């Protein structure tokens, strides 16, 4: 795709005659937000390719239907923050923007240092920050922007772990890749047995591959629309200049399939995979949407987001009464570790049942967006008969 596939109210059907999009019998239909790369120059241990000017920067590369990662430091384990520091005056009321590192862990002479990202693990969320400057004398790193809040759970604290991502000097392991943003040269270190002839390499371009956009506040809904047997793949996400940090569940991130005002509709036998963000978002006004027998795998963040983070005064904007049944969620949080398999925000009466959920770093199913006694729409949700295992894995400290 050169742009997301878009549907609006005029594209829906009726209860008697729903609009159906199905894979042809025996067909393999992939809606891809990426571009297959070819024309590699092959050397002894690496392939190189000059990317065109219109190819956006990307954070994951997909090789033979598997995510491949940029070089990071340390190559195993994590670095430890030597000392958490108060924010600088510019961000005193906004969030953390610096910490003291152990001497030698960070270097000012890294190639394209502005492209290096610090992945800071908090209690239940993760901040991905860019480097503004390094004070070698004091061993202090300053970010280009603050974390999401000054609360303890959003600050880079003493003893917290962090990774350094996208370091060209660490490129030494088969399966890794590095894109030089200045020269636009992509370098890939192939795994044993991989050749340009037997290897499909896809660079993601689009953040979304399918957008379904109604306007529930104006009673303009998309209804009776169904998708069967389709694959949604190869979405992109790039760290913004100020970094990325959010409260919980990677809730601010986009999804490969995003819907507003979608009702009485179905996703059946679909695959959501090889993504840098979430799989699906059922936002404001999405009601009675059934997601059944679908596979969500190799996810950059989470699987499905349902609802909104506020309580809309206009009840037409409420999302709920949806079903997630007999689906498989696996290998999530591969780039944004705090993404859960299923997140129900301010949304009532949803049913999540008979799903297999495994290999996520955050919760399998998260419900709600209220930390206290304020009004919540997250009532009447039923979570039943799901098989859940290999969750948390001690990556985030609350799991």
Predicted regions and their residues:
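Extracellular beta-strand solenoid repeats
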Residues: 6, 22, 30-32, 211, ...
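The substrate-binding groove and active-site-proximal loops of carbohydrate-active enzymes
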Residues: 253-258, 276-283, 305, 309-316, ...
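A generic beta-sheet turn/junction motif
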Residues: 124, 284-286
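Extracellular polysaccharide-degrading/modifying enzymes targeting complex plant/algal/animal polysaccharides
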Residues: 1-261, 266-271, 312-316
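Structural detector of coil-to-beta-strand junctions
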Residues: 4, 207-209, 256, 278-279, ...
